[in-house]
Every structure is written in C-alpha cells, then in structure tokens.
C-alpha cells in the first residue's frame, strides 16, 4: 500500500480544556486507560508468516507538550495553528509493530486553555471505542476511575468468540455465520460492485486515500421536518437521509443498482459495552432502483433492507470480500466506494471540577472511500456533519455540489414522496426555469441565402477567382457556374425533377463537386455513395434511396439491381454544349431536403438522414463565421463524399469566396503523400479525423503559422491534442452527429488544457439531460441533446426511429431536439466534455471501460507510434486487447511485453490494462478515416505475455507457482497469467504474500505485487529478496508471542505500511491458543 493508506486508518479527536489543568493527572489518566484496555497495548507483527496482534505489557504512553502561548493573543490565529498542528499529528505515520497505537499531544494556548490531541489507529480502536477512551480518560482525571470499574471484556476475547473459538463456546455460532453467508450471497447476487461517480480527475492506478471534507448541516427546523415525516411513515430519519443520499449517488453515477457501505457498531452483546478495540463492521446495503421506485417506495425499501443488514452484520468484511471475490481493484475500495452514517453527536462537552472540556473531530485529511456522508444528531435537534471526499478524484466545488443536491432531494422527499427517483430534480430550479440550463451558441448575425444561390452570387462578384481544383483540372467561379448549369440541364433531361433524389457514386474531384451542385441547381436531392464501399452496402443505399438518376463513372459497371437511370459523370459534367440554353432554375424551399446522408445503423442496414437546405445553409453560415473563412483561404478536402463532414470541405470555401483543393482518396492512406499535400503552397485549412492527423504527424508534417486545423469525426485522444496544440496551427476540435448537420460544437485546442468539445456553434443550443429530458447539474453525466436550425428533417422512411430520436423540445414550443445518444458532462467552466456513448457502454469484469483512455496510455509507451484498443468477446469472456504500431524492432526484445504491461499498470487502473497485446503494421481505418475497431481482432502478431500459458522454468518460478496452485486450487499456472484473473482476490493475495515470506524468505510489498501480479514478476522479486533474515518469534513474560528483531519498514505505517486494513487477514494471539484470524473492515 502507499503511505496514505496507513494514515487513512486513523482516528483523531481534539479536546479543548479551559481552566486549571493538572498535567500530571492528565498523563496518569491516559496511562491508566492504556493499561486497562489490552487493545491499546497491541501491536501488529509478522509471526511465522502471519500478521499477528501482539499484546505487550508495561506499555507507557507519552504526552508531549507544545507551547503555543507565544504565538499572540489573536484567538483566530491560535485556532488556525491548533488545527494545523492537529492535521499534522493526525497524518503522522504509525509503527504498527510498536504499541501503543494511541498517542497524545498537549498544546498550551494559555495558562487556562490547553488543547489535547488524541490519535488512535483503527486497527485497535473504532469510533465507539474512542468514546469509551474519552469517557474513562476524564473519569480517571477526576480521580473516580471508570464507572463500574470491573475488568472489561478484552478485545482478544471478543475475537476468539467472534471466530468460534473453543475458549468461549457458542453453540449457535456456526449456524449464525452460515446464515450470514447465505444472506449476503443472496442479497448481493448480481449487484454491481463499482459505482462510477463523475470525477474531476482520472482515477489513479492506486487508491490514494487523500481526502477532504465539506460541511453538511440541517438546521433544527429542517431536521424536525425530516423526523416528523419519517415518524408518520413508520421509518427512521436514518433511512430518509440515506434515501436522499442514495438518490444523489444514483443520479450522479448513472446507476440504478448500487451498494452503500454502512458502519455498524457490532456490539449487540451487553458484555461488549465497555470493550475497546475494532469491533465495528462495515456492511453493504443494496439500493435497487431498477424499477424506478418513488421516493417513498425507496425509503420503505431501504428501511426493510436495513433489517437484514443489521441481523447479519457480524460477518466480518474481509470474509464478505472472500465470499464475493470481487475483481481486483487496487484503485478503489472493494465492494463499495461510498459510505453513510448517522449517530448521536458525541462531540459534547463535560464540566469537570475547575475544567470545561469541549470535544471536536479532527479532519485527518484522508478518505477511505470515494465519498462518505457522516451526520450527527445534535442536542438542539439540528443534524450536522460532513461529506468526506477523495481529493484525488473530486474538487471541493464538486463535493459542495453533491451536498447541495442532498438538500434538494430531501426537500422533494418531504414535499412529494410520490415522485419517481428518475424524476427527481437535482438542479432544484424546477421546470419553469430549466430553459436556463441550455447552453446557447448565440444568434446568427443575419440569414443567408441557400447554398447554390450564395455561390452564384459570389461568382457574379468574383468570376475569375479559383473555385475548385483537383490533380487534373481547376475551375474559376464563372466556369464552375457554367458547368453546373450544363450538368443540371442534363440531369433534368435524364429524368431528375424537383424533389427527386440523385445518387452520385464517383471519385472525389472537380467532377464530383459539379455533380453535387447540379443536383441542387436542378431542384433535386443529393445522395452521395462511396465507390470504395463494399458492393452490398452500395446496393443497400441505392435500394433505400431509390434515386431517379445515378451519376457514376461507368453506367455499365454499376450494381445490377438498381432501377435508376445511370449517367456517366464524365458526360454529365462536361462543358456546356454549343448553343445550349440555361435551364429554368427551380426555387427549392428552405425546408426541402438538400441531401440524404447514409450512416451506419445498429441493425446493420445503413440509415438515411434527410438534411434540409436551411439546415445546410445555417450550418455553413455559423461555422465559416466562427472560423473566419474568406476569399484568401484554400481548403484541402480529404474526406470521402459519403461522410457528411466532406460538405464543409467542399462548400465552406465556395460560400465564402475561397478555393477547394480536392485530394484523391489515396491521400488518406499514404502518410508521405498526405504530408506533402498538406504542405502544398497556399493551403490554409484542412479537416480530418484524429486518425488521419496522427498519420500526417507521423510523416513529419508540421503546419505553418496561420494554418487552420479542424479535427473531428471521433473522440480526440489527449495525447494527439497535445501534439496538435504544440504546433503553430489554430487547431479546433469539432463535434456533431449527421442528424444535426455536420458540426454542432467546437473547441479551440490549446496547450495544457483538457480535451473538450467546447461550446455550441452560433445558432445551436444544447442540453445535457437525463432520460426524462430533465437538465442535469454541471459535472453530472447525461445525454447531449442538440437543438436549433441544424436539427435535420429525420430518417428516410422510418417515422418510428425519427420520432424516437427527434423529440419535441419541452422548453421551446414548436421546436425539436435531437437525442444524440452521446454521454457528456458540462464542466464548471461551461465547456462540454465528451464521455462516451449511451448505447455502447463497454464493461469488462464490472468496470466501465473508456477505450480512448487506454489508447492514450498505449501511445505513450516507448517506441509506440500509434495504437488502438478494443474489447474482445464482450458478451462472454470479455477482455481488452491493445494493438500497437511501433518503431522497427521496438517490440521484438525478450520480455518487452511484460515491460509494456508494467508501464501500462503505472498509467492505468488495473481494470483497464489490456490482457492481450498485438503488434500491427498499421491501425485499420474505415473509409471515413475513423479507426475501424471491427477490423482489429485477428490482426497482428500476439506479443508474449498475454494470457497464453508459459510454464515455470526457474526454481523460483516453480516455487511461486506451487503456492499459487495451492491457494487458487489449480493444477497448474503459467508464469505470465494474472493472479486475479485466475480467481484470486485481496485476501488470498495477503495469504500469498505471507506464505512467500514464511516459505521463501521474501517480503514482497503489496503495491509491487498489485502492479504486476504474475508468477514471473514475483519469482524475480523473490530471487532478489531471498537473502532476507527470518525473524524468530519468542514469548513475552505473559506468554504472548513477540518478535525480537527490529520491525522492518513493511511493518511500519508511514514508513512503508504494506497492509490495507479493509482486506488483510490479521490474527490475535492470546495465552495458550493458536493465532485466530481476524477480518477488519474500513
């Protein structure tokens, strides 16, 4: 574990002592408490490979004094200094082998004002035990001693009894323990053990345990309303508050089934009332929201479930982990990542003779899980507490937002508990003001004419300016208009009338541009078809589009089943015939369809999206204005015409007086050719997908000053964003589905800034909403909905799909929103962060997987030029595969795969490290320039170190493998197989590391094992450590085992504590008995 892990399992309290303090009496009182309770004289030591609790007699506790009296009379300054000192003392590491695991510090502020700071480790003390310590400390100080001063039941006795020891026979123990196991197995069957709350930073590979708190308070009046409401419904305030917290968690985490950890005192036996030790347990309570209960139903369900939790709360958390065998998660707490607690406030004061004592919690600056809500019922009826959050994951503003949402949900419970959980308003504004939740790109300055009239208007002003060119020819604006007029006349003669569809199946170039414009000049609908697409796809598109005319390279070689009249593009786009007149120009209405763009459908059949002339004109007006395109610009067109973003390339320059330079389709496939074309004289702008830009950069291309670089079509990887931002170009990340007309949002790519899709373009508005189209708060993941003039007409001949995706805008009557199916979140700075797809949430072993994050880590590996990732067998034995394009020889060295996996383990959570790696010559791209993930499986050379079995070869490997086989109950294991992938879990890992030390003399740090849990890595470590000295246990005078050797750093807390108290198996040694395992929870 890391250093913070040892610090995270500490408790600290501050006692303000006002009056005449007798320091000697206080020291004696504290020593008496330590002497009375064995747990406070207990240390943790390795004995015969087992981490054992050792009770040591004659332990003394010191009470050093710090004099702050000279810091000045300012009370606020003194209080700040005390809080700084308290935090410092609470975060100081522990030597777990050397009791007492309790320490004190006395700060003198004035002769009549002292502050006592007490810190104790969770290994020997829980929250109720700390209350006992405080009470007895003050009773001892007054000279009376603990009330009812009989010898308390010691913690070691409790452990023996709780584990079914013979010294304290309990005939019902076995039956009770079995019933608990059956209860938890049944209750938690199928429950997700990961709650993915939206975080402000990427989760580190190892849980950091660093934390902070924000206050949560319900004043007396509000708290009384909660109590009254709960009493009327026969439930407790605990359940009502828990329900509100659950709703906040579920709605923020996008979960309908989650586990919340509940601390349980676990002191049902009367004899345990005065016992000091770690008796508490933390039990998961399952909140099942899959049926979308009302708030009232949720409260009742949680109340009923609490009964089962409390009845079976004595099953130790470690045994529960062993029972559930959750996936390896060194980056987060197992089973649950959120906690809740409510108790009577023990932070009260005492009036002693001559001394007033006030007690206050100390914020230790840690967080054992992602998020914890701990509340206390105060004497005046108010409910006060804090929300503790993992500061490695969340900003304070995010935690404050969670706290505000808790109040919002509570008010809705009290106001109307008939509201379904899915309908709860986290924003708290109510539907009347949800229009403010839209992010608006601002108005368009003035309406534009439709595209063809706009081009004709510019041609009249700049007839000799170059309009379009390819490798074979170039046309100025006047020639372009003449060609389009002639082509439109031929289309009309071929049977294409106003409103008819015209399919253009041709290579990119000047002729394709003329054919496209001729469709509109003739009043028709443009339907681009990629000639490089497979024949079955081309046939499906033509079948659905049913064009009146098919424009193609050679009518005799086209799909045999189409019924359209075929026209050769060479004939169509030739110069006008001598004497040919100009045909009448139809006047399409703004809302008539301009083009039909086919995209991939979930059923395997392409779906056609109909986009109007007004959609297209508004988009071009908005984005060309945003990019400030003008007559001086020359845009290199790289994209296939069957991808809607090509329309920006072909039309953006033509509606602003610039020039389109059309590259052949081969330009995207050859890095050198691509780089050369981008570097051509005069090219000022280009648009491409991330994969194509990476290809250009790999060939050494660098944009010149003033170059405008447009990137979109798929998620922009952060590493590529950094590369683009480092160039002199003005780089933009663009986002938009075909259904909202090409691009809807844009963001400047700047050095050092996170990747976002920015804000809407002018005229567009977007909403981040839940499934019921209610706005979600900033930071919360939701579906992106797009409104405005870019929202397309709908899907061709598919009214049901159109109605499902193009929905009425509930906040702008008469308008529509398009449901993109993309998951985003609105950041606090107003920028939109793309998260993933609603319908393509990839999960592997219970974890949500972001392939883009994995790919960024793969590309950061030494010698790797490009990479992609995919999930193999997502419905069966799901596993992540990484595909690497590397420098020559970079992946050929022996052990390279293992080193790559180690590097990945340091950059990614364990759940995201690919289990298989492949070397490939290039990442496959589809015709649109996007990564073709479907083409990845089955390609490339498998790198050794994946899941194929490699037998042990060295003595150390054979020894380690034998231990694995024994613990995992397997006949054999390979040296590169993953311990956790074979069924191991954290408790077995603890057993394994103890056996390695006992049998092989190697003390392996837990963190090192978790980074690469393979036989090969362990064997190498064992070989290095096998010379370590074995420690021999001896006996204390009272018969308790003790070590004579000085504890090693691994036994120490801040000095390298290797043990995580929620999951490690520990033992208590008592006179005349063998070590008894003890499971410890958070």
Curated annotation (Swiss-Prot):
Name of the protein in its database record: Nonribosomal peptide synthase SfmB
The entry's keywords: Antibiotic biosynthesis, Ligase, Phosphopantetheine, Phosphoprotein
Biological role stated in the UniProt entry: Involved in the biosynthesis of saframycin A (SFM-A), a potent antitumor antibiotic that belongs to the tetrahydroisoquinoline family. Specifically adenylates glycine and loads it onto its peptidyl carrier domain, via a thioester linkage to the phosphopanthetheine moiety.
Stored CDD domains: A_NRPS_Ta1_like, LCL_NRPS-like
Originating species: Streptomyces lavendulae
Disordered: annotated segments: 1027-1082
CC cofactor: pantetheine 4'-phosphate
One GO BP: amino acid activation for nonribosomal peptide biosynthetic process
GO molecular function: 2,3-dihydroxybenzoate-serine ligase activity; phosphopantetheine binding
Root EC class: ligase
O-(pantetheine 4'-phosphoryl)serine sites (modified residues): 986
Family the entry assigns: Belongs to the ATP-dependent AMP-binding enzyme family.
Keyword Ligase: yes
Known EC number: 6.2.1.66
Gene disruption: observed consequences: Inactivation of the gene completely abolishes the ability to produce SFM-A.
Pathway: Antibiotic biosynthesis
Carrier domain sequence ranges: 951-1026
Highest taxon above the source species: Bacteria
Compositionally biased residues, Basic and acidic residues: 1037-1055
SMART domains named in the record: PKS_PP
InterPro entries assigned to the protein according to its UniProt record, in alphabetical order: AA_adenyl_dom, AB_hydrolase_fold, ACP-like_sf, AMP-bd_C, AMP-bd_C_sf, AMP-binding_CS, AMP-dep_synth/lig_dom, ANL_N_sf
Gene: sfmB
Catalysed reaction equations from the record: holo-[peptidyl-carrier protein] + glycine + ATP = glycyl-[peptidyl-carrier protein] + AMP + diphosphate
């Amino acid at each position: 574990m890391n250093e913070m892990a040892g610090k995270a399992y500490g408790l600290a309290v501050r006692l303000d002592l006002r009056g005449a303090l007798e320091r000697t009496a206080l020291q004696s009182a504290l020593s008496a408490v330590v002497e009375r309770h064995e747990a406070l004289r207990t240390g943790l030591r390795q004995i015969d490979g087992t981490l054992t609790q050792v009770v040591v007699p004659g332990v003394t506790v010191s009470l050093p004094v710090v004099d702050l009296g000279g810091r000045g009379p300012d009370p606020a300054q003194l209080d700040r200094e005390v809080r700084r000192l308290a935090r410092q003392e609470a975060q100081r590491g522990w030597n777990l082998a050397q009791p007492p695991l309790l320490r004190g510090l006395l700060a003198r502020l004035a002769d009549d004002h002292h502050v006592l700071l007490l810190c104790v480790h969770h290994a020997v003390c829980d929250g109720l035990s700390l209350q006992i310590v405080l009470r007895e400390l003050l009773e001892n100080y007054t000279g009376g001693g603990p009330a009812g001063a009989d010898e308390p039941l010691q913690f070691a006795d409790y452990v023996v009894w709780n584990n079914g020891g013979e010294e304290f026979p309990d005939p019902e123990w076995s039956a009770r323990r079995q019933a608990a196991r059956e209860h938890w197995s049944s209750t938690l069957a199928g429950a997700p053990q990961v709650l993915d709350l939206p975080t402000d930073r990427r989760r580190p590979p190892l849980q950091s345990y660093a934390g902070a708190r924000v206050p949560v308070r319900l004043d007396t009046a509000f708290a009384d309303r909660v109590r009254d409401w709960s009493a009327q419904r026969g439930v407790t305030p605990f359940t009502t508050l828990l329900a509100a917290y659950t709703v906040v968690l579920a709605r923020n985490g996008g979960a309908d089934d989650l586990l919340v950890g509940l601390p349980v005192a676990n002191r049902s036996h009367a004899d345990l009332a005065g016992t000091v030790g770690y008796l508490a347990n933390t039990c998961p309570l399952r909140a099942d929201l899959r049926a979308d209960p009302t708030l009232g139903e949720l409260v009742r369900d949680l109340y009923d479930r609490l009964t089962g939790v409390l009845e079976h709360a004595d099953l130790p958390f470690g045994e529960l982990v062993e029972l559930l065998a959750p996936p390896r998660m060194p980056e987060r707490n197992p089973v649950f990542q959120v906690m809740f607690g409510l108790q009577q406030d023990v932070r009260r004061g005492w009036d002693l003779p001559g001394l007033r004592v006030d007690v206050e919690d100390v914020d230790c600056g840690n967080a054992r899980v992602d998020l914890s809500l701990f509340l206390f019922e105060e004497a005046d009826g108010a409910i006060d507490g804090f929300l503790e959050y993992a500061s490695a994951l969340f900003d304070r503003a995010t935690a404050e937002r969670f706290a505000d949402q808790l109040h919002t949900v509570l008010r809705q419970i009290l106001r109307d508990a008939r509201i379904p959980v899915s309908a709860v308003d986290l924003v708290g504004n109510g539907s009347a003001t949800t229009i403010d939740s839209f992010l608006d790109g601002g108005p368009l300055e003035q309406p534009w004419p439709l595209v063809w009239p706009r081009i004709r208007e510019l041609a009249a002003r700049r007839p000799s300016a170059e309009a379009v060119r390819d490798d074979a020819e170039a046309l100025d604006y006047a020639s372009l208009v003449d060609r389009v007029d002639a082509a439109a006349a031929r289309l009309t003669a071929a049977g294409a009338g106003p409103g008819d569809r015209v399919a253009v199946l041709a290579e990119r170039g000047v002729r394709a541009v003329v054919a496209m414009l001729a469709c509109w000049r003739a009043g028709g609908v443009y339907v681009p078809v990629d000639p490089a697409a497979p024949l079955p796809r081309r046939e499906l598109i033509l079948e659905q589009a049913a064009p009146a005319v098919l424009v193609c390279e050679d009518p005799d070689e086209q799909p045999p089943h189409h019924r359209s009249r075929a026209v050769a593009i060479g004939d169509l786009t030739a110069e006008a015939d001598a004497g040919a007149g100009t045909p009448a120009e139809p006047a399409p209405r703004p809302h008539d369809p301009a083009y039909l763009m086919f995209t991939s459908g979930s059923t395997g059949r392409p779906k056609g999206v109909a986009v109007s002339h007004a959609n297209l004109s508004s988009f071009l007006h908005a984005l060309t204005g945003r990019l400030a395109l003008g007559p001086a610009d020359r845009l290199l067109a790289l994209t296939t015409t069957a991808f809607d973003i090509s329309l920006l390339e072909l039309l953006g320059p033509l509606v602003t007086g610039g020039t389109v330079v059309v590259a052949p389709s081969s330009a995207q496939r050859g890095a050198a050719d691509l780089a050369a074309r981008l570097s051509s004289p005069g090219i000022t702008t280009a648009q491409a997908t991330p994969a194509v830009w990476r290809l250009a950069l790999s060939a050494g291309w660098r944009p010149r000053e003033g170059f405008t670089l447009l990137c979109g079509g798929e998620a922009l990887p952060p590493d590529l964003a950094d590369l683009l931002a480092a160039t002199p170009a003005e780089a933009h990340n663009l986002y938009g589905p075909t259904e909202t007309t090409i691009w809807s949002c844009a963001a400047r790519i700047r050095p050092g800034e996170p990747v976002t899709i920015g804000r809407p373009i002018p005229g567009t508005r977007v909403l981040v909403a839940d499934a019921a189209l209610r706005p979600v708060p900033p930071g919360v993941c939701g579906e992106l909905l797009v409104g405005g003039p870019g929202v397309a007409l709908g899907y061709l001949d598919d009214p049901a799909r159109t109605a499902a995706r193009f929905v009425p805008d509930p906040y702008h009557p008469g308008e529509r929103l398009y449901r993109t199916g993309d998951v985003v979140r609105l950041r606090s700075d107003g920028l939109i962060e793309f998260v993933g797809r609603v319908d393509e949430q990839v999960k592997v072993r219970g974890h949500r997987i972001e392939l883009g994050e994995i790919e960024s880590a793969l590309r950061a590996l030494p010698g790797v030029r490009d990479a992609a990732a995919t999930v193999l067998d997502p419905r069966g034995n799901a596993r992540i595969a990484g595909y690497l394009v590397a420098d020559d020889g970079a992946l050929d060295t022996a052990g390279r795969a293992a080193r790559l996996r180690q590097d990945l383990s340091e950059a990614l959570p364990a759940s995201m490290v690919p289990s298989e790696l492949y070397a490939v010559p290039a990442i496959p791209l589809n015709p649109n320039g996007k990564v073709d993930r479907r083409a990845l499986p089955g390609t490339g050379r498998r790198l050794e170190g994946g899941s194929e079995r490699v037998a042990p070869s060295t003595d150390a490997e054979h020894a380690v493998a034998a231990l694995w086989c024994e613990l995992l109950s397997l006949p054999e294991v390979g040296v590169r197989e993953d311990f956790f992938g074979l069924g191991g879990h954290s408790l077995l890992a603890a057993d394994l590391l103890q056996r390695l030390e006992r049998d092989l003399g190697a003390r392996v740090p837990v963190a090192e094992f978790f980074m690469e849990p393979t036989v090969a890595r362990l064997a190498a470590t064992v070989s290095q450590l096998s010379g370590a000295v074995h420690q021999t246990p001896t006996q204390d005078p009272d018969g308790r085992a003790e070590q004579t050797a000085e504890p090693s750093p691994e036994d120490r807390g801040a000095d390298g504590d290797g043990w995580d108290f929620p999951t490690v198996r520990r033992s208590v040694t008592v006179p005349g008995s063998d070590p008894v395992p003890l499971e410890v929870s958070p």
